[in-house]
């Protein structure tokens, strides 16, 4: 009996223990009215989360452990943005935090700009999430690291807020500079900026070099300089822009909308420079359109000019300037619309690329007419006094700012060349291997093709007339050689002194041994003449340019100074001939030697294979080429020095278009700092790095083929 009662008691204990275990493992079901206020709110939030799929309550993020983990994860995110983006995608798949507002049902186009930017950027989204709940925000020591993160650059500021259309139009209307003034002041500012940068880097080089600092010292310096970084960003060197308040021209960072938005405190210095470069392209186009419109309204459409000029003369003088004006107006309108979309400019090179490919052919037509335009203008000034007086009267109008009529006629050619340089300026500042870099490279390539077509159009017109004029002046003593050819043009012409007679009779007293001869050097032919009365030239020898060899004589006294030997491996009589020629100066001798037979070791060497530490100069005074072998210089041009003479001439290569030629050294100043020279070369390599390899290979093959034929 007692045994049975003990068994029943044991069963009862087991049953109560089992019931107690089940009760502990079941979810607590408590009535809401019995809960305190805080617990009731938590229960309501829990009910909302139960209705939403894949939701969870966030953990306590403000603990010491989680803050340390968060720092490490942010550092990894900065080093590997792709992984950060994938982690963000996974977290969005798993669910949203209760502290994050649900915006999935809001259309993308109607979302607030700041929210759109923050959702686009993982770092900005995390910053918003952490700062939305008290106690879960990022600590102050984390803010500098977050501000320096690459994710807070353009990606985080893609959608700030648009500039009002009226505000932007007022800005365009307030640009009081004509393009001629804008261009001159802009290039002068660029020269001055390079001088300052050269001086700053040179001062830093004279001090303790940064490369000698240890990593720990560099980190300490970065930490010390970090709080003062926002003021330094505002005092960045201005790039190619006008900062004179009297010019009624503003920088991008000086716009009221930019200053009030606070983006200058968020954007990195390189991004601000990029914004300034894109802003300069837009505002310079507005200034160019203003000057072009003045050419049409003030000069071309003047009733008195229409009465004086014949329709054919007016057509040659103004060409298709109306087409150029229409393209510029549409181009500027699209740039304005892009500026109105956002105070932080996303890109402008895509618009430049589209117009360069589809619409800028009007520039080729206008510029190709430049030779006839200049000649017609000179003839009208000489032959029609009424036209000359009227132009002088119109130039005195305050609208023209004292600028001559000829400066308005060359506006399209100046603009298309300057536009390519502005795109280069943007290309130097965009992120490498980014979409904006690809767009800038495409735009630059299209503009380069347009500029080359313009140059070829001008050269073709002038070369044809020049060859016809030379052909009329030549009389052949030997077998006649056809001069006029579509593939032939003049490289250099001039007078030299030939030393004749046997070597034993070449004494310093027999000055009659020197005879004057005249040389015409074409790109594929050398013609040696004697000048005869009547402005004629008698040809007595010729040879293909590829069969010429030159040799400089050693210094043999004042009389034989500047003397070199010219060898014709096969002349007009199919024989070898040698000429000892004397030039008037050392520079003239070197220029003839360079033109007659370029250094065959460097003639076919590509630009990128040259020495990095090459002497460089920048143009500080414009120079117009006087001879075919000279190079026309524009302000702020950077050139590599390939050769120079003691009497002040330099043979150089311009970096932005790789054109070669001679120019006076007084027009330039040397860049002494090697860091600046290296930076200029690196920027040049980056601009030209995306050239078509197949095209370059075919070009090199053609050059090598021509060398073999020579």
From Swiss-Prot:
> Annotated Gene Ontology MF terms?
ephrin receptor binding; guanyl-nucleotide exchange factor activity
GO CC terms:
cytosol; glutamatergic synapse; growth cone; membrane
Q: Which UniProt keywords apply?
A: Cell projection, Cytoplasm, Developmental protein, Differentiation, Guanine-nucleotide releasing factor, Membrane, Neurogenesis, Phosphoprotein, SH3 domain
Give residue spans, biased composition: Basic residues. Answer: 700-710
In what ranges is there compositional bias, type Acidic residues? 213-227
Q: Which residue spans adopt a coiled-coil conformation according to this UniProt entry?
A: none
Give start and end of each SH3 domain.
Answer: 612-673
Cysteine pairs bridged by disulfides in the record: none
Biased composition of type Basic and acidic residues is found at 1-11, 26-41, 687-699
What residues bear Phosphotyrosine in this entry?
A: 179
Q: Which Pfam families match?
A: RhoGEF, SH3_1, SOS1_NGEF_PH
Expression across tissues: Highly expressed in brain specifically in caudate nucleus and to a lower extent in amygdala and hippocampus. Also detected in lung.
Compositionally biased, Polar residues: which spans? 89-102, 127-136
Its PTM note reads: Src-dependent phosphorylation at Tyr-179 upon EPHA4 activation increases the guanine exchange factor activity toward RHOA. Phosphorylation by CDK5 upon EPHA4 activation by EFNA1 may regulate dendritic spine morphogenesis.
Has the keyword Calcium been applied to this entry? no
Q: Where is this region: Regulatory region?
A: 1-273
In this chain, the stretch annotated as Disordered covers 1-143, 194-236, 687-710
Question: What are the DH domain coordinates in residue numbering?
Answer: 273-457
How is this protein organized at the quaternary level?
A: Interacts with CDK5R1 and EPHA4; activated by EPHA4 through the CDK5 kinase.
What is the protein's known function? Acts as a guanine nucleotide exchange factor (GEF) which differentially activates the GTPases RHOA, RAC1 and CDC42. Plays a role in axon guidance regulating ephrin-induced growth cone collapse and dendritic spine morphogenesis. Upon activation by ephrin through EPHA4, the GEF activity switches toward RHOA resulting in its activation. Activated RHOA promotes cone retraction at the expense of RAC1- and CDC42-stimulated growth cone extension.
About its domains, the entry says:
The DH domain and the PH domain are both required to mediate interaction with EPHA4.
Q: What is this protein called?
A: Ephexin-1
Tell me the organism. Homo sapiens
């Amino acid at each position: 009996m007692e045994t049975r009662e003990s068994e029943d008691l044991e069963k009862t204990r087991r049953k109560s223990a089992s019931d107690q275990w089940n009760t502990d493992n079941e979810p607590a079901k408590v009535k809401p009215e019995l809960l305190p206020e805080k617990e009731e709110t938590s229960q309501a939030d829990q009910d909302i989360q139960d209705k939403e799929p894949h939701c969870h309550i966030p953990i306590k993020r403000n603990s010491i452990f989680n803050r340390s983990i968060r720092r490490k994860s942010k550092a990894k995110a900065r080093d590997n943005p792709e992984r950060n983006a994938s982690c963000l995608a996974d977290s969005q798949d798993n669910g949203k935090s209760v502290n994050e507002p649900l915006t999935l049902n809001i259309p993308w186009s109607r979302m607030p700009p700041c929210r759109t930017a923050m959702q686009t950027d993982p770092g900005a989204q995390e910053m918003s999430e952490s700062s939305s709940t008290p106690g879960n925000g990022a600590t102050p020591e984390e803010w500098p690291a977050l501000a320096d993160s690459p994710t807070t650059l353009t990606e985080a500021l893609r959608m700030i807020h648009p500039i009002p259309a009226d505000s932007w139009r007022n800005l365009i209307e307030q640009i009081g500079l004509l393009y001629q003034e804008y261009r001159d002041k802009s290039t002068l500012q660029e020269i001055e900026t390079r001088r300052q940068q050269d001086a700053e880097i040179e001062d830093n080089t004279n001090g303790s070099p940064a490369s000698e600092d240890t990593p720990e010292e560099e980190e300490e310096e970065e930490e010390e300089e970090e709080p003062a970084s926002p003021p330094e960003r505002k005092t960045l060197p201005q790039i190619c822009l006008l900062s004179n308040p009297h010019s009624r021209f503003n920088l991008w960072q000086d716009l009221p909308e930019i200053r009030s938005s606070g983006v200058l405190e968020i954007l990195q210095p390189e991004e601000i420079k990029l914004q300034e470069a894109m802003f300069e392209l837009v505002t310079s186009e507005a200034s160019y359109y203003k000057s072009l419109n003045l050419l049409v309204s003030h000069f071309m459409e003047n009733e008195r000019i229409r009465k004086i000029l014949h329709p054919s003369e007016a057509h040659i003088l103004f060409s298709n300037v109306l087409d150029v004006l229409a393209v510029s107006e549409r181009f500027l309108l699209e740039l304005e619309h892009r500026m109105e979309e956002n105070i932080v400019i996303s890109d402008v090179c895509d618009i430049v690329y589209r117009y360069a490919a589809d619409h800028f052919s009007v520039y080729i037509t206008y510029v190709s007419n430049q030779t006839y335009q200049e000649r017609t203008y000179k003839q009208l000034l000489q032959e029609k006094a009424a036209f000359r007086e009227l132009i002088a009267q119109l130039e005195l109008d305050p609208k023209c700012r004292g600028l001559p009529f000829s400066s308005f006629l060359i506006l399209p050619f100046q603009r298309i060349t300057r536009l390519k340089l502005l795109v280069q300026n943007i290309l130097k500042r965009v992120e490498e291997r980014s979409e904006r870099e690809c767009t800038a490279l495409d735009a630059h390539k299209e503009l380069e093709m347009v500029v080359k077509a313009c140059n070829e159009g001008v050269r073709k017109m002038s070369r044809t007339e020049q060859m016809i004029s030379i052909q009329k002046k030549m009389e052949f003593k030997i077998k006649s050689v056809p001069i006029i050819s579509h593939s032939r043009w003049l490289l250099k012409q001039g007078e030299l002194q030939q030393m004749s007679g046997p070597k034993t009779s070449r004494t310093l007293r027999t000055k009659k041994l020197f005879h004057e001869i005249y040389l015409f050097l074409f790109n594929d032919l050398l013609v040696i003449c004697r000048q005869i009365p009547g402005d004629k030239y008698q040809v007595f020898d010729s040879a293909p340019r590829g069969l010429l060899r030159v040799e400089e004589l050693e210094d043999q006294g004042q009389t034989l100074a500047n003397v070199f030997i010219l060898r014709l491996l096969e002349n007009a009589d199919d024989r070898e001939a040698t000429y000892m020629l004397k030039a008037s100066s050392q520079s003239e001798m070197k220029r003839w030697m360079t033109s007659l037979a370029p250094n065959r070791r460097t003639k076919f060497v590509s630009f990128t294979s040259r020495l990095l530490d090459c002497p460089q100069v920048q143009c500080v005074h414009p120079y117009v080429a006087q001879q075919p072998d000279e190079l026309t210089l524009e302000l702020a041009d950077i050139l590599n020095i390939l050769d120079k003479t003691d009497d002040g001439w330099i043979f150089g290569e311009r970096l932005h278009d790789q054109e070669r030629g001679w120019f006076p050294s007084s027009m330039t100043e040397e860049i002494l700092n090697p860091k600046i020279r290296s930076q200029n070369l690196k920027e040049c390599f980056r601009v030209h790095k995306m050239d078509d390899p197949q095209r370059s290979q075919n070009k090199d093959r053609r050059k090598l083929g021509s060398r073999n034929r020579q």
